[in-house]
Amino acid sequence: MTSINITESAQEHFAKLLAQQPEGTNIRVFVVNPGTQNAECGVSYCPPEAIEANDTELKFENLSAYVDELSLPFLEDADIDYVTDKMGSQLTLKAPNAKMRKVNDDAPLFERVEYAIQTQVNPQLAGHGGHVSLMEITEAGIAIVQFGGGCNGCSMVDVTLKEGIEKELLAQFEGELTAVKDLTEHDRGEHSYY
């Protein structure tokens, strides 16, 4: 069963909005382009006639959230909150698995590392317009990654790799990974500038 957490403040916010809609209207939580780098989550009104037979209904105290079959696995562990601060109020929707489906603990090492990169590393790099891709894992347990986007040519790549990405992945995959290297560093040859 998919676990989508809608906080009490978000439920109250939705209940106020739904009170102004025709009776029987609930909400729909969905992912556009699920399983891709361009995945985006959204929430919309869901009138009774828009409920599909293969939708999953998640019941909350004052409302139901409907999720379509395709979006369901990508909304695992999603969190919807309504936050109020000095700047005002806003709805936040965090879906760590929107870009990549959750993998099992017994999945191959490559899939588990790829999942960690997509769900933990890339969201941090996205703020700088960058991302990292897992290219291969050598027999010696070295994860070879390639930086892209805003990270390409950035002077902070080495620091990001050693202090951030490598530390995080080696702690998470202790005994399975021995190092994390940048493809250009691992592949240095005649084409390299330095």
Swiss-Prot record:
InterPro entries in UniProt: Fe/S_biogenesis_protein_NfuA (IPR017726), FeS_biogenesis (IPR000361), FSCA_dom_sf (IPR034904), HesB-like_dom_sf (IPR035903), NIF_FeS_clus_asmbl_NifU_C (IPR001075)
Needed cofactors: [4Fe-4S] cluster
GO biological process: iron-sulfur cluster assembly; protein maturation
Residues where [4Fe-4S] cluster binds: C151, C154
GO MF term list: 4 iron, 4 sulfur cluster binding; iron ion binding
Keywords of the record: 4Fe-4S, Iron, Iron-sulfur, Metal-binding
General function of this protein: Involved in iron-sulfur cluster biogenesis. Binds a 4Fe-4S cluster, can transfer this cluster to apoproteins, and thereby intervenes in the maturation of Fe/S proteins. Could also act as a scaffold/chaperone for damaged Fe/S proteins.
HAMAP family attached to this UniProt entry: Fe_S_biogen_NfuA
Subunit text: Homodimer.
Name assigned to this protein: Fe/S biogenesis protein NfuA
Organism: Aliivibrio salmonicida (strain LFI1238) (Vibrio salmonicida (strain LFI1238))
